[in-house]
Each structure stands twice: as C-alpha cells, then as structure tokens.
Design a protein with these regions (language model features):
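Alpha-helical transmembrane segments in inner-membrane proteins
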Residues: 1-337
Length: 337
C-alpha cells in the first residue's frame, strides 16, 4: 500500500507552486493574440522591480488578460477547496460546493440583477456581484434554518435534502424570471454557463480575500475533517464539537461559493473532479488533500479557460461548458479505475 506523509512538505509546496505559476504564464502568453514568453517575463520583472513595463504589452496583459487569468486561478482554487471540504464533511464522494444549494441562490441574485437591473446601494461591488453575494448568504440562512427546524442535530442527510429541494425551487424561480426577461436571455444564459471574461483586478482582490480568510479556516479544520471521515459519532468521542464544526465549515464553503458565482457564474465539476484527482496523488489525509486540491483546482480551471478561449477562436466558449465536458470524462475514468 502506498504510504503518504501526514502533512504537505516544503518541496511539495514548491513543486505545486511552480507548476501553477508555469500554467499561469502559459495562459497569459497564449490567446487570440500570442505574446512571447520572454516579453511576458520581462513584463513581470518590470512590475516586480517597479520599472516601466514594455509599452506594447501594457494594453494586452495589464488590463485584460492578467486579471482574467488571476481570477480563473483563484476561482479554481476556491471551488476545489470547497468541494474537498464538502466531500469530507458530508462523507459523500459526489458532494461539492453546490450541494448546499448556495450556488443556486447566488445565481438567482445575479439573474435578478441582470434581468431587472436591481442593485444594492451602498455596496462597493457591481450590481450583479453584490446581489449574488447577498443572495448566497440569504440562501445559507434559509437552508440552515430549515435544516435546524427539521433536525436540531443538523444531520448530513437533512442538509443535503434541504439543499437539493432549495436548488429545485430556485431553478423554477429563475425560469419564471427568464420568461419575463426575454431580451436578456442570451446574457443570462451565457452567465449561468460560467464565464470570467471581463474580470478585473477588483474581482481578483475580492476572490483573493475570500480565499485567504475562508481557506485558512478550512485548512485549520483539516484534522476535524479527518475525524468526520470515520463518522460523526467517533468524532464526538474524540472531543469534536460536531455541530459547531459543521456550521463553521458550511459558512466558509458558502462564502467561497457565493463569491465565485458572483464573479464567474456557475462553473461545474471543478469542486467535484479535482479533489478526487488530488486524492489519487496525495492520499485521503485532509492535511495534504486540501492544499493539493487548491493547487489542482487552479491549474484545472486555468487550462479549461485556455481551451475556452482558443478552441473556436475568435469565438469564446463559456468556461462552464469546457469544465463540464472535460470533468465528466475525467470523472468517469477515475471511477472506472
């Protein structure tokens, strides 16, 4: 049997970081307009040293491609981390961040903003983004409230059931809204398929902040997730406050999902497939699985976005279409093995 170390070692962090940076550079260089790697590295070197970057690259890298690739990497890392946490928490290999139904709630908020131009005054983000985040929080409150009403112990089965029912209910509401906003159907459809085109440095900052805070909390719960793997009763016996741990992890996952959906729409399979791929590489211990999932999710989504940009150039596919197609194939291969 293959043996794994209990925690991520320094050389593993360095290796995963180098691979992620290499893929990031590839995605920045390749696109509808290809930029030589030497020029790209010169641009990064100039930015790091505070020098003036080459004029020809400023218009293509700085305001357009680089923030998009950064947002893609951060979104992939967040979705994959959320998926790994949900699979460990719910002891369900088919769980991911959308299992809760929070992503459906965030999508509803964005659809309302797109269809009717509704905005929330006083918030620093654009209308679609702020509505998605707020509706993600409201969805979490509804789901946890109903789950607690039915089962005060917040059992896994109750949470999953309420999440599925809530998602179906929200989907019906979105269908009604689309019926009354026929002129916005194309924009709504493209958004719900997932797309990070037009991402800005502000979006990247929001994603980075959410990932830093929520990711740190989830990583600190790695040992608790290991305890959940052997059952909630066993976790209680070794001193884990099961209800509190569930609430904390569910809130952190919901925040990550809400922010990701608000920036890039609904992107499927990232939180489902990449944790399984990471588990094959580093084992089931969450102290290793969670960081590996983050790196794997970033790489997977960056490559998917690259395919979406260049496959039908000059047309661009929604990134959710690529992740669903590739993810479904990879998922079948993983389970076949």
């Amino acid at each position: 049997m293959r043996r794994y170390h209990e925690t991520f070692r320094l050389w593993e962090y360095l290796l995963f970081t180098l691979v992620t940076l290499a893929v990031l550079c590839l995605c920045v260089c390749v696109g509808s307009v290809r930029i030589p790697l030497v020029d790209t590295l010169a641009y990064f070197a100039a930015k790091l040293t505070g020098d003036e970057p080459p004029a020809g690259l400023v218009s293509s890298i700085l305001p357009i491609r680089l923030p998009r690739v950064l947002c893609v990497a951060l979104t992939g890392a967040a979705l994959s981390l959320a998926g790994a946490a949900m699979q460990g928490l719910l002891k369900n290999p088919l769980a991911d961040g959308s299992t809760l139904g929070v992503s459906s709630g965030a999508s509803l908020g964005a659809v309302i903003a797109i269809a009717f131009g509704v905005t929330l005054p006083g918030l620093p983000f654009a209308g679609t983004m702020s509505m998605a985040i707020v509706f993600a929080f409201l969805s979490l409150l509804v789901i946890l409230g109903l789950s607690y009403k039915l089962d005060r112990s917040l059992s896994t089965n109750t949470i999953i059931l309420i999440g599925v029912i809530f998602s179906m209910f929200v989907s019906s509401i979105m269908s009604i809204i689309i019926t009354f906003a026929a002129d916005k159907v194309q924009r709504i459809t493209f958004w719900t398929m997932g797309s990070l085109s037009g991402s800005t440095y502000q979006n990247a900052a929001v994603l980075a902040g959410a990932l830093a805070v929520c990711g740190a909390v989830i990583l600190l719960h790695a040992q608790i997730l290991n305890a959940f793997a052997v059952g909630e009763d066993n976790a209680r016996q070794i001193g884990v406050d099961v209800k509190r741990a569930k609430l904390v992890l569910l809130v952190m996952v919901s925040v990550l999902i809400g922010v990701c959906v608000s920036v890039g729409g609904t992107i499927g399979f990232v939180g489902l497939v990449t944790p399984h791929m990471a588990r094959m590489l580093v084992g089931p211990n969450h102290k290793r699985l969670l960081p590996a999932s983050m790196f794997g999710g970033a790489v997977f989504l960056m490559l998917a976005d690259l395919i979406a940009r260049i496959l039908l150039n000059p047309l661009e596919l929604p990134i959710g279409v690529v992740t669903s197609f590739v993810g479904a194939i990879v998922f079948v291969v993983i389970f076949y093995q």
